[in-house]
Amino acid sequence: MTMYERLMTLPIFKGVGTEQLSLFLEKTHLDFDNYEAGAVIQPLLEDCNGLKCVLTGRTEMVYTLSGGESRLVAEYGPGKVLGMERLFGMDTRPRHEVRALEPCGTMSFSKEQYMSLLRSNHICLINYLNYLNYHCQRIEVSMESLYSRSVAGTLAVIVSLMTDRDCRRIVLEGMDRLWATGPENAQADYDRQVDGLVDAGYVKFGNEGEIIIESRQSLLDYAESLQEQNR
């Protein structure tokens, strides 16, 4: 895959012609970096002052849940653009860390250069607005169509809100501790429901009680069907 072909797969350049992309590359100062497996690509709570595009390699995004009681780790392939949701607004510090799962290559450019691109290219502006719109709307969509008083519904809401559609694999750690703080029978009910999800193939167990979700969409579809049944 050529560099142009790789860049055309990035969501910020979706639908942009080769000539327009060439013009942007000619006018923009770009930083290219390489990361070894395990290296931090995006630190937690560091001010976002530009975009970083993952051109090669797999990454994982690590989120803390419930005040650190639990964690969600989401795996993504090449083509992820980091910083889009934190580039503007009152809080520009990402609430998750991004690490390299294998050697990764990135391309970065500043917020000012991206703003110049948005002013000069309406396709890129629409791409960015669509991205922000998706992130805003999925909150009410998730709560309306997925949430139910079940483990499947709770997991689906977390996954829907915290991960994107191109997520390859999700690992949830410490979810059992959330139910352990509930009523006396909550832990047993949690174990029973998770076992049912494992038997049905929606999740599987990892190390030390990890819940592994190989297909994000399958879990969301199942949770939505449960919500439909309860209406």
In which residue ranges do the predicted regions lie?
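Polybasic "coupling" helices that flank or enter modular domains
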Residues: H122-N185
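Phosphate-/nucleic-acid-contacting segments
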Residues: S160-R231
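Cyclic nucleotide-binding regulatory module and flanking cytosolic helices
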Residues: M1-F32, E36-A37, V81, R86-G89
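A cytosolic small-molecule/anion-sensing beta-strand core signal
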Residues: E36, L55-T56, G77, E102, ...
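Cyclic-nucleotide recognition modules
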Residues: L72-N130
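Short phosphate-coordinating micro-motif centered on Lys-Gly-acidic
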Residues: V40-E46
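Glycine- and acidic-residue-biased ligand/ion/polar-headgroup-sensing regions
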Residues: N49-V62, P78-G79
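A short beta-strand-loop-beta hairpin characteristic of the jelly-roll/cupin
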Residues: T59-R71
